[in-house]
Amino acid sequence: MYAIIVTGGKQYKVEAGQAIYVEKLDAAAGDKVTFDQVVFVGGDTTKVGTPTVDGATVEGTVEKQGRDRKVVTFKYKAKKGQHTKKGHRQPYTKVTIDTINA
């Protein structure tokens, strides 16, 4: 059985036991989280939400909080000696999916 959930403005296809990286959640490592925005549930029977599936939830456990690799932006003006260098590291949360309730 699998489900498609929405969190952080993105959609993720998840199965029980799978580890996923999502946008940062306000939860510490070891906390339980529940995703209630489930737009699709597949398996023996298929349920499609309009926009979400009624009563469907996905439960998971937060494994860790972290930051992604650095993304560097570099701008420059030719022949002027002007340049700007900036870096950004996006925070993320690693979640292990425990159960899919449909």
Swiss-Prot record:
PANTHER family in alphabetical order: 50S RIBOSOMAL PROTEIN L21, LARGE RIBOSOMAL SUBUNIT PROTEIN BL21M
The entry's family comment says:
Belongs to the bacterial ribosomal protein bL21 family.
Summarize the subunit comment: Part of the 50S ribosomal subunit. Contacts protein L20.
Q: Which residues form the signal peptide?
A: none
One matching Pfam family, short form?
A: Ribosomal_L21p
Q: What is this protein called?
A: Large ribosomal subunit protein bL21
Could you state one GO cellular component term attached to this entry? Answer: ribonucleoprotein complex
* Single GO term (MF): rRNA binding
Does the keyword section mention Endoplasmic reticulum? no
Q: Which GO terms describe its biological process?
A: translation
Q: Which gene encodes it?
A: rplU
Q: Does the keyword Membrane apply?
A: no
Q: What keywords is this UniProt entry annotated with?
A: Ribonucleoprotein, Ribosomal protein, RNA-binding, rRNA-binding
Role: This protein binds to 23S rRNA in the presence of protein L20.
What PROSITE patterns does the record tag this protein with? RIBOSOMAL_L21
Read off the InterPro entries from this record. Answer: bL21-like (IPR028909), bL21-like_sf (IPR036164), Ribosomal_bL21 (IPR001787), Ribosomal_bL21_CS (IPR018258)
